[in-house]
UniProtKB/Swiss-Prot annotation:
GO BP annotations, alphabetical order: DNA recombination; double-strand break repair
Family annotation (HAMAP family): RecO (MF_00201)
Function statement: Involved in DNA repair and RecF pathway recombination.
PANTHER family to which the protein is assigned, alphabetical: DNA REPAIR PROTEIN RECO (PTHR33991:SF1)
GO cellular component, one term: bacterial nucleoid
Keyword Kinase set for record: no
Annotated source species: Xanthomonas campestris pv. campestris (strain ATCC 33913 / DSM 3586 / NCPPB 528 / LMG 568 / P 25)
Gene for this chain: recO
Statement: the UniProt record of this protein carries the keyword S-adenosyl-L-methionine: no
Family: Belongs to the RecO family.
Coiled coil regions in record: none
Name listed for the protein in its UniProt record: DNA repair protein RecO
Pfam family, one: RecO_C
Length: 241
């Protein structure tokens, strides 16, 4: 099958043998596509190598043969954002999450849009945490895993003053009592859930609980295997960077 003049974001690229790259691309029309880019080394291939870097938006032509498509041509459409520090790790995170969750050869246009919006947010220099929570919400919605952010699992309106535990299947379950500090760490305020549903920035003190709760839901859909980017972000936090 010929994939011609397709747009896609490069999620990951790694060396294969001496002169080639294995590249994962998130496309509009074909979902996540694995590309084999042969002969990318040498001075004449510098532009091609630059185009096949994570976060880069490219247009490419490839021939699908089995699991991998043979890359025939690729060029950068724009300039990928130059990210540093935590923003760079956040870029690694959004790419890794879709590398794990986006289905192969199954178009989910919403995921392409999610990635484009998150990439633009990182490039803008805006606050990272809120942009990442929006990204996670939209990815879950795009994959059909989203949940009601206005009502709890019993169908009752979410109370901004209450606390909830996010269940990957049932959504927000109201917590009636918190006996231990750990119980509180594993819950999120109703106010934060309502804000997420209404696309409003939650209160600063509610953001850590929202992050932990969303991570728990994502971990379920990742079959219990965490992300390397999570480990890197946690190590950065421990070092006080």
């Amino acid at each position: 099958m010929l994939i011609e003049h397709e747009r896609g974001f490069v999620l990951h690229a790694r060396a294969w043998r001496e002169t080639s790259l294995l590249v994962e691309v998130l496309t509009e029309q074909h979902g996540r596509v694995g590309l084999l880019a042969r002969g990318v080394h040498g001075p004449r291939k510098q532009a091609l190598r630059a185009a096949l870097q994570p976060l880069q938006l490219i247009q490419f032509t490839a021939v699908q043969r089995g699991e991998l498509a043979q890359l025939r041509q690729a060029e950068a459409i724009d300039t990928a954002p130059r990210l540093l520090g935590e923003a760079m790790l956040a870029g690694f995170y959004i790419s890794e999450l879709l590398l794990r969750l986006a289905p192969r050869h199954a178009p989910v246009p919403e995921l392409f849009d999610c990635y484009a919006q998150a990439r633009a947010h990182l490039a803008s220099g805006a606050a990272l945490a809120w942009g990442l929570r929006q990204f996670e919400r939209d990815v879950l919605d795009g994959l059909g895993f989203g949940f009601d952010l206005q009502h709890d699992s019993d169908g009752q309106p979410i109370d901004p003053a209450a606390r909830y535990r996010l269940d990957p299947q049932d959504g927000a379950r109201r917590v009636l009592s918190e006996r231990l500090a750990q119980d509180r760490r594993e819950t999120v305020t109703g106010a934060a859930l309502l804000a997420l549903g209404e696309d409003r920035v939650p209160a600063t003190e509610d953001m850590p609980g929202l992050r932990r709760s969303m991570r728990g839901v994502l971990l379920h859909h990742l079959s219990g295997r965490g992300l390397k980017s999570w480990e890197m972000l946690e190590e950065l936090a421990r070092r006080g960077a």
